[in-house]
Amino acid sequence: MWRTKTLESMLCSPMKCSSSNIGGSYAQSSKEVSNTTKREVHLPPCSSIMHAPLTPEINQAALPPPAYHYAPSSLHQTEDPVWRSSPNSIIFSPVIATPQPFPLTFVERQSCCPIYSTAASSYTAQSVPPSMQHFQEENHRAVSNEQYSLPNVHIGQNPGTLLSQTQTDLDLIQKQLRAVVKLRKQCPICGKVCSRPSTLRTHYLIHTGDTPFKCTWEHCNKSFNVKSNMLRHLRTHQKKIAKKKHQ
């Protein structure tokens, strides 16, 4: 028992001393800090505090250049400026949002790719309400009629009437062509229709009186409006010479 009491007295005595010393040192340090704060701190007047700006002034020269972070975007981009703060400075980084594209309607898909509209008919039949399905079917029928229908063809028209109509159109075209050809072969003075344009030209020389074809025999000054007549006249000269030789 005596030994245990002595050990307890020995262990407790230094702890008490150390705690008293620590308390005294802490009191001295707190007094010194309060004295220094009273000496060094100078509070400004209330008027200057009331008129001072709320936000602190930031030195622009100390700030680094603004860093812009751009997110990957699709065709439609919207800018959403966000302030991001760092330990050293404030960086303004406009982040570009990437909204999800809206699904194309049936008309837009059909105008872009008609094959896609036929392939996705089963999907649209399940995901579209009945009223919209009716509108889509009507639009699909209209587009198919525009692409594959013949011009000037009415629904319910008899094919025989169509053939007769086309035949009459062809007959009218042929008549017009004949009239044009007839005008090319018809004399504008007497109205005679020639078989060929060349004969029309020779016939026209009769009305004008021109004789462009002259005889090539020496000392013969005859001229003709038709080349065949000139050649016939030239043969007469040759026959006369042949008769003289035989005599």
Curated annotation (Swiss-Prot):
SUPFAM superfamilies tied to this protein: beta-beta-alpha zinc fingers
InterPro entries on file: Znf_C2H2_sf, Znf_C2H2_type
Keywords of the record: Metal-binding, Repeat, Zinc, Zinc-finger
Gene3D superfamilies, per database record: Classic Zinc Finger (3.30.160.60)
Zinc fingers (C2H2-type) by residue: 185-207, 213-237
Transmembrane segment boundaries: none
Molecular function per GO: zinc ion binding
GO BP, one annotated term: DNA damage checkpoint signaling
Name of the protein in its database record: Zinc finger protein YPR015C
Organism: Saccharomyces cerevisiae (strain ATCC 204508 / S288c)
